Amino acid sequence: MKKVLLITTILLLSFSIQAQDNKAKDLLNKVTSIVKGYDNIVIDFKYSLNNAKENIHQDSKGNVTMKGNQYVLNFMGVTKIYDGKKNYTIVPEDEEVTISSVNEKDDSAITPSKMLTFFNSGYKCSMDKLEDIKGRKIQYVKLVPTNAKDQRKEILLGIDVQTKHIYNLIETGKKGTKTTLTVNSFKTNQPLSKNQFTFVASKYPNYYINKLD
């Protein structure tokens, strides 16, 4: 009798976990579908890095404009422009521009556009906590890397229940470092200049141009 009860309990628990995993996958699929439906996306964000053991605490703000695979990212005093073929990294402090090619087929290459859909592969996902943040219902999905060599322990992805937009991303490393990216503003289908993703060299007359390829 005890064995029957134990087996029944294990089966019920397995079904419950499977159902939670399926709910998480369905939610992530909805997020991906909605993001891909926009012509362009403009995001203002806050980035925090903390490691209590190493006494590290850093806060930064940034913004990114995306259209397809093109983007302009402003973060930590550096501007990165990707026009679909070349990557331009502009560093005013050093008066330098680095130009390089990007292999779009390289899955390991992290780009702003991939940050909104990175969770589609390489992770085991499950539903986590539901929080009320400033009147918004934020559903968290826990992502655990399937690669044992990954230095990240887990990622909590906060999703606005109503809009299905990503609210924040909390990444915990195996060595205790926690990084949090919080979306302060998420705008879509904005009027953009036709030269929004074009690098104009004449704007940087005294800069050193470093062409890597």
Roles of regions detected by a PLM:
Residues 1-4, 20:
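Positively charged n-region of N-terminal signal peptides that target proteins for export
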Residues 5-9:
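Sec-dependent signal peptide hydrophobic core
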Residues 11, 15-56, 69, 208-213:
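N-terminal leader/targeting segments and the immediate start of mature chains
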Residues 41-47, 60-64, 71-73, 153:
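One face of beta-strands
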Residues 47, 91-92, 170-173:
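Beta-turn initiation residues at beta-strand->coil junctions
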Residues 61-109, 179-180:
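An acidic-aromatic
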Residues 86-144:
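Surface-exposed, polar helix/loop patches in the mature regions of secreted/periplasmic/lumenal proteins
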Residues 126-204, 209-212:
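Gly/Pro-enriched, hydrophobic low-complexity segments
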